[in-house]
């Protein structure tokens, strides 16, 4: 029986060439799988047909936008997920859902292996292959770009030689990845960490230095998940899409950072994530209003670790599942509305309210109606500072 390989297919040069490359190198039949996670751009039916033209025996397109939002973006919002306190895991979140569908397709079509188009310098190779190890350890993984020396020049020559329907005349200077949660750009002039990113690299966001009227949004949350915008109940997909448009129009969500990659190198990355930054800003602020202090403090460490393991390709790990259990529990009661002003590239919280607010005006006010008994403070300070006082007395005794 002829071997079958399921290829993570984007419709671009590398994965289109990989269809024929895999067939020529291994004799296997290739099943192309494109997963729609809200990346936009080219029509997915055109991509599906291109795979057939390039030699695939089967071509599948999966609309996974709702699943991506509900099962991957939503947990990231609850976990305030920002790798290195800045990057909202745009690509990191999309890889495990692609792996999930690759494995399902492999089982359905009797495939022996899956394939991806990742290089050996990036994080995605780890995310794909460790994900496969977790879900289907018996499947082999083929990585033609990394393992077979399939350079861009060789890929172009391969495509031209076989007349593949791929336009390679307009080579973008950037490597782009995008989905519902944001857009990433690297390579080209961006590899110089001193060089200012040219404006043509940005697509999701307007220039934040240009003066324009501000916008204001009110985001509603239920148990830590966004459920409405400006009083309208919306699905998470629609809510994120609208915020990408409105916050992006105000230049919100541009990130220029030096990132520590999993493989050990530093890279310069440009991200555009207007909805992600707006939602994470609002969610964290609502947590400050509703979470008990020790839970909030502990959760910050959990959130950081959650972002790290997802970035590192361990979505399917038992640790992430365990962290999710804490995050889900802590999120109960994180319900309310957050009002955000969008202007000049900044999403600024200007108001928040919650039926479960722990803010007590009668305790916080310095005006009439203050119910905080300030005479309690002296005894509290004496007890709170007692360990420090005892330690200081010992130090003075031993080191007069």
Curated annotation (Swiss-Prot):
Q: Which GO terms describe its molecular function?
A: argininosuccinate synthase activity; ATP binding
- Which PROSITE patterns did the record assign? ARGININOSUCCIN_SYN_1, ARGININOSUCCIN_SYN_2
List residues binding L-aspartate: 119, 123-124
Binding residues for L-citrulline: 87, 92, 123, 127, 175, 259, 271
Q: Does the keyword Transport apply?
A: no
* Record keywords, A-Z: Amino-acid biosynthesis, Arginine biosynthesis, ATP-binding, Cytoplasm, Ligase, Nucleotide-binding
- Span of the signal peptide: none
Q: What catalytic activity is recorded?
A: L-citrulline + L-aspartate + ATP = 2-(N(omega)-L-arginino)succinate + AMP + diphosphate + H(+)
User: GO CC: one term?
Assistant: cytoplasm
Q: Give the EC number(s) listed in the UniProt record.
A: 6.3.4.5
> Which superkingdom is the protein from?
Bacteria
Its GO biological process annotations read:
argininosuccinate metabolic process; L-arginine biosynthetic process; urea cycle
**In this record, what's one Pfam family?**
Arginosuc_synth
> Which subcellular locations apply to this protein?
Cytoplasm
Under SUPFAM superfamilies, the record lists: Adenine nucleotide alpha hydrolases-like, Argininosuccinate synthetase, C-terminal domain
- Which pathway does it serve? Amino-acid biosynthesis; L-arginine biosynthesis; L-arginine from L-ornithine and carbamoyl phosphate: step 2/3
Has UniProt tagged this entry with the keyword Amino-acid biosynthesis? yes
Entry binding sites for ATP = 8-16, 117
Subunit field text: Homotetramer.
The Swiss-Prot or TrEMBL record describes its family as follows: Belongs to the argininosuccinate synthase family. Type 1 subfamily.
Q: What is this protein called?
A: Argininosuccinate synthase
- This chain's source organism reads Parafrankia sp. (strain EAN1pec)
Gene name as annotated: argG
